[in-house]
């Protein structure tokens, strides 16, 4: 039987090592993680898809400008939650888009799109 102080120490060490791995904080499964590289080709492609798909669905004419911030969530594929700057006529506004992406199936779906 392990003495109680040693058991407590082992528990604390285990909890600490589980909280930080490789200098990175762990995110709960299914949690949203900030996107580190907003200018990556993948993120830009998803953002442009979101604006284009919104324009088709809403018969709108927004023009993509940039990604302001974004998060990903691992599901059966990846959810992207992006704040996108887009031009509506002469006015640039921010819009939040959620896109579900499964690249191995060539599947991409605009889940939501709204002005923020």
Curated annotation (Swiss-Prot):
GO terms for cellular component: extracellular region. It comes from the Eukaryota. GO terms for molecular function: cysteine-type endopeptidase inhibitor activity. SMART domains: CY (SM00043). A motif (Secondary area of contact) lies at residues 73-77. Glycosylated. Its main location: secreted. Residues 1-26 form the signal peptide. Glycans are attached at residue 109. GO terms for biological process: defense response. Belongs to the cystatin family. Phytocystatin subfamily. Specific inhibitor of papain family cysteine proteinases. Inhibits papain, chymopapain, bromelain, ficin, human cathepsins B, H and L, actinidain and house dustmite endopeptidase 1, but does not inhibit human bleomycin hydrolase. Inhibits papain with an IC(50) of 2.47 nM. Does not inhibit cysteine proteinases belonging to other families including clostripain, streptopain and calpain. This is Cysteine proteinase inhibitor 1. It comes from Actinidia deliciosa (Kiwi).
């Amino acid at each position: 039987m392990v003495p109680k102080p040693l058991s407590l120490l082992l528990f604390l060490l285990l909890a600490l090592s589980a909280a930080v791995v490789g200098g990175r904080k762990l995110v709960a499964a299914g949690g949203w993680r900030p996107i580190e590289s907003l200018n990556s080709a993948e993120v830009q492609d998803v953002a442009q898809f979101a604006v284009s798909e919104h324009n088709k669905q809403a018969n709108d004419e927004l023009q993509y400008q940039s990604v302001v911030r974004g998060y990903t969530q691992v599901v059966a594929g990846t959810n992207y939650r992006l704040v996108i700057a887009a031009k509506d006529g002469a006015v640039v506004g921010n819009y939040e888009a959620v896109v579900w992406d499964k690249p191995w199936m060539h599947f991409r779906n605009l889940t939501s799109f709204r002005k923020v």
